[in-house]
């Protein structure tokens, strides 16, 4: 069986394929409901450990789905907990594709538990715009806890920061290994020189 090793654990190619298939189907359901599109790839991205490539299993696949800014305005204007209602609308869109799955809202996300142990957490988000209407790279997302409010995230920046930290660690490790190799070569050279 083909596998990909991640930090000592294994996520099989079959599991990755199943995650990808479910991701595409959920994306299509959300796009159909909120964008009037049948695309399986636009307006969504993997985030969290799976998005960073550091996942060790499939028990928590995080997805950000971008919704139209008009939907933000609609749910923000509602009296009461509009954020909770947004999560319910997203849940209902996904239920159209996965009617037999355990799906529920949980704080900021819609959770989909599959019987095979794979779990998705889908975060609905809206591009945050600057004063001129340009996207600033950040997203607003709902928090239905304590009456509801909006929070902000920048997943691309977080992914880039993680890549930079990993690169720094690799450079540090590479430098350390290089120093060790030079030390060993020096010792071997001295030993060989003494034996000659």
Residue ranges and their predicted role:
Residues 18-23, 83-86, 173, 177:
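Phosphate/oxyanion-binding active-site loops and adjacent basic polyanion-contact surfaces
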Residues 24, 91, 99, 103-196:
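Catalytic cores of NTP-dependent nucleotidyl/adenyl transfer enzymes across multiple folds
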Residues 82-98:
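A gly/proline- and charged-residue-enriched helix-loop-helix capping module
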Residues 64-66:
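Short hydrophobic/aromatic beta-strand micro-patches
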Residues 6-7, 29, 93, 180, ...:
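Residues that form generic nucleotide/phosphate-binding pockets
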Residues 36-37, 41, 96-105:
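Short secondary-structure junctions
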Residues 1-45, 49-58, 69-81:
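N-terminal regions immediately upstream of nucleotidyltransferase
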């Amino acid at each position: 069986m083909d596998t990909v090793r991640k930090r000592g654990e294994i996520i099989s190619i079959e599991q990755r394929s199943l995650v990808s298939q479910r991701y595409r189907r959920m994306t299509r359901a959300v796009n159909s409901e909120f964008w009037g599109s049948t695309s399986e790839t636009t307006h969504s991205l993997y985030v969290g450990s799976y998005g960073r490539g550091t996942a060790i299993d499939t028990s928590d696949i995080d997805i950000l789905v971008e919704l139209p800014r008009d939907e933000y305005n609609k749910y923000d204007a509602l009296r009461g907990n509009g954020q909770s209602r947004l999560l319910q609308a997203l849940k209902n869109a996904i239920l159209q594709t996965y009617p037999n799955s355990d799906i529920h809202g949980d704080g900021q996300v819609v959770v989909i538990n599959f019987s095979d142990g794979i779990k998705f957490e889908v975060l609905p988000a809206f591009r945050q715009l600057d004063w001129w209407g340009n996207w600033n790279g950040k997203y607003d997302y709902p928090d239905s806890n304590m009456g509801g409010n909006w929070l902000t995230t920048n997943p691309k920046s977080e992914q880039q920061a993680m890549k930079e930290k990993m690169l720094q660690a690799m450079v540090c490790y590479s430098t350390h290994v290089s120093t060790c190799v030079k030390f060993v070569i020096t010792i071997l050279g001295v030993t060989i020189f003494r034996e000659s």
